[in-house]
From Swiss-Prot:
It holds the Pfam family Methyltransf_7. The record marks H149, H221, S265, M313, H328 as: Involved in substrate discrimination. The keyword 4Fe-4S does not apply. Optimum pH is 8.0-8.5. SUPFAM superfamilies: S-adenosyl-L-methionine-dependent methyltransferases (SSF53335). The keyword Transferase applies. GO terms for molecular function: metal ion binding; methyltransferase activity. This is 7-methylxanthine methyltransferase ICS1. InterPro entries: MeTrfase_7, MeTrfase_capping, SAM-dependent_MTases_sf. S-adenosyl-L-homocysteine binds at Y19, C62, N67, D99, L100, S134, F135. Belongs to the methyltransferase superfamily. Type-7 methyltransferase family. The gene is ICS1. It comes from the Eukaryota.
Amino acid sequence: MGKVNEVLFMNRGEGEISYAQNSAFTQKVASMAMPALENAVETLFSKDFHLLQALTAADLGCAAGPNTFAVISTIKRMMEKKCRELYCQTLELQVYLNDLFGNDFNTLFKGLSSEVVGNKCEEVSCYVMGVPGSFHGRLFPRNSLHLVHSSYSVHWLTQAPKGLTSREGLALNKGKIYISKTSPPVVKEAYLSQFHEDFTMFLNARSQEVVPNGCMVLILHGRQSSDPSEMESCFTWELLAIAIAELVSQGLIDEDKLDTFNVPSYWPSLEEVKDIVERDGSFTIDHLEGFELDSLEMQENDKWVRGDKFAKMVRAFTEPIISNQFGHEIMDKLYDKFTHILVSDLEAELPKTTSIILVLSKIVG
């Protein structure tokens, strides 16, 4: 697999398997977390940030769907509300949209309508800029951000976990692409260690960029259980591994490619997130909660329609990194196989998806 920061991005464009057309679930997650963002803006104003001429915010891992537009609109709306309540001067809002270099910034900015940004004569003038690069390192000058938002991005890792091959060069997570019930303990330990390292790097970079008392609102894909091999946190990757294994058995994929591939993502528990933040010591935890949503739109009666929708959603965020390992030419067959395996499981109750909302304040001093 190539370097993660070169191959990790959502499916580009606006076609039927693009992220832009298959982000309904993450939109639902974002809407559930929107009160936390609204409260963060309220908190900033309570700390006299309304005295500033401009509020600077960043949406990290913004991708190219409509979610980031909702973030901008929410921040702007809350600023306008506080301006009217506090009779403060006209404010300016600077928003930086960040993602890795492979992100579809063209589709992103093409969708940035005047309805989102508004005009420069309103109570809050809004200016938007793109910032390509990895949020695991520094992106902005010191003490330049008042508010940081990130949704469904921080659980991605900078690389596949280290130490997943034996001294003899044998794969320790053979036949799997993520933590599973059959994975040896070293696999779980390696994933947690990599997440700890990467999330700590993220916090360290933001601690230098966020002003004292500034806020961060982070939404992560997570889990309720303390065991990362429970189906709630490995369901998607388990089905993908089964689909890949079937293509291996048909001679369409080299077995070694499966055995040496481990997804660079980790869905943490609330306790793990809390522990890392407290160990870092740069931020206080204002709010931490987990909530569950159905993985599929259960109001759709036809299981094939439901399965197809879920498969397209999964393909939208997994295909670039999966195709880099297994080849672009096999993707249609792989996700068709994934859909068939998924539909055969739809008779049973599927695990709900857990999301984590984490609100942090930069410690003064």
